[in-house]
């Protein structure tokens, strides 16, 4: 499918896979020649997951080449409808909706961080790119509406009420917001 690493992170999956397969007439349906599952940790982002997959893929390629050389490459048919085929992502898919859960926002940001386009929110008609956030699990602000700027931490850090908890902006484009404002 399209954007498999981004989708795996954005959906909060606990694992993904590196798969080599023969091309055929349909999307991602050819016979599999190598597949390795990889765990996705809470700390993983687009960059770290990409490196994990690439490291495994290098090992897989060596094994595939050795098996080809020995004429021992095994092909495994894929189950019809057994894999995930995700749709193409658009710009709106990267927009932070503060009504989302803190985990969903965290997952969205880590999925779209550099080298990708970044998650974003709109403040005073300006798109603000967000590269890293921290999830703060607390019941202290349960009765505050999502999107409220709760506090300023350091030079650029803001704590913002999410649907269920709090999100701290750790790394984002420069923006000046006031405590009490709503996004």
Indicate residue ranges for each PLM-predicted region.
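Acyl-group handling in specialized metabolite and lipid biosynthesis
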Residues: 87-100
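A generic structural signal for alpha->beta connector loops
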Residues: 17, 92, 125-127
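Short glycine/serine/threonine-biased micro-segments
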Residues: 10, 28, 69, 92, ...
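A short catalytic or substrate-binding loop motif that flags glycine-/basic-rich loops and adjacent residues
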Residues: 12, 88-90, 112-113, 152
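Amphipathic alpha-helical surface "interface" segments used
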Residues: 80-90, 129-130
């Amino acid at each position: 499918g399209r954007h498999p690493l981004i989708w795996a992170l954005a959906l909060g999956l606990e694992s993904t896979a590196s798969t080599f397969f023969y091309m055929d007439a349909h999307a991602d349906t050819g016979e599999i020649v190598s597949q390795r599952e990889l765990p996705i940790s809470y700390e993983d982002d687009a960059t770290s997951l990409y490196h994990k997959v690439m490291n495994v893929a290098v090992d897989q390629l060596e094994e595939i080449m050795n098996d080809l050389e020995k004429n021992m490459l095994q092909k495994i048919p894929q189950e019809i409808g057994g894999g995930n085929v995700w749709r193409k992502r658009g710009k709106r898919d990267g927009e932070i909706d503060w009504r989302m859960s803190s985990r969903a926002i965290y997952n969205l940001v880590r999925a779209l961080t550099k080298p990708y386009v970044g998650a974003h929110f709109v403040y005073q008609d300006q798109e603000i790119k967000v590269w890293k956030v921290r999830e703060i699990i607390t019941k202290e602000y349960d009765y505050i509406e999502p999107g409220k700027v709760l506090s300023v931490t350091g030079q650029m850090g803001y704590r913002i009420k999410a649907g269920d908890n709090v999100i701290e902006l750790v790394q984002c484009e420069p923006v000046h917001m006031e405590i009490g404002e709503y996004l």
